[in-house]
Amino acid sequence: MTIAFETTPLPIIGAPMAGGTTTPELSAAVAAAGGFPFVAGGYLTAEALAPLVERMRETSETFGVNLFAPNPVPLDRAAFDRFATALEPLAAEHGVTLETEPVDDDDHYDAKVDWLVAHPVPLVSMTFNLPTAEVVDRLHAVGTHLVATVTTVGEAREAAARGVDALIVQGPRAGGHSGTADPTREIEDRPTADLVREILAEVDLPIAAGGGVDGAEAVGELLDAGASAVVVGTLLLLADEAGTSAPHRAALQDAEKYSETGLTRAFTGRPARALVNDFVREFDEVALDAYPAVHHLTKGLRAEAKASGDPNLLHLWAGTGHRWAVPGSAETIVKQLGTRFAR
């Protein structure tokens, strides 16, 4: 079986960066360059996702839709309350009212799966958890390839057992949320290429891989390790078409103030790699595993930081290759990364 991301002229996938970063314009530019585009379905209702998918259909016949698969983590209410209390002075300083009663949601997952079954697309990928065999079967029945994001060999084995068609292997150096099915585990640093080799030794499925990509050489390393395509997110954050906020863009280009990244649960309650700023330094130690409750708790603060242009309170998602992100058209960036590996 040939997976959709194996058919594009260039073996580059534009990462589905939820929350407005992966815009329709960014996806279109990735497709125009010969890469594989995604519609980022995270944080959207089915009604909001629908027009983005239909717009993508007008741009490219080959594309994917990414969803957040529910992965409930038992909430430690006392730890949550301690974190909320620690945030109160900062919230008061910025005139923000915190959502101190824990909010739970499934990101409209069932409704989005229902919509994708009724309006089939070439490929659907899942992150944050593995799809159930039932969901795999429903999407297969309408001709959709199902891809699971995995971060360990164990997750890869389980995904294969559930019948997925391919894997996206996310290394620990990737920016933004880890797609791990176990967000409570400690995520150890390692090259993504090593993880790809380990998984391919155990699982016979096509693989796309990403995490820590800082240029064309890194793309080549992942392809040499056995990946069919390479997922790029951080290197597209400064693209003209990306929805990256102004303070996020400024921080990415300020190597003196924002020189390192780290995995933190402080913004959302789920491990995510970000540029280390004041918020991370102050609250990482008291943060807890409680997604989406912490996401909702800090949402108002992050919105205020974005509106006021303050990068020190903002979730500055970035992988370890962030220093090599440059402004320009996404089409040019994708071609620079993938042209030498054209199929």
Question: Where in the sequence are the language-model features?
Answer:
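Active-site entrance/lid segments in N-terminal catalytic domains of soluble metabolic enzymes
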Residues: M1-E202
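Conserved active-site-proximal phosphate/metal-binding subdomains
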Residues: A174-A208, V213-R343
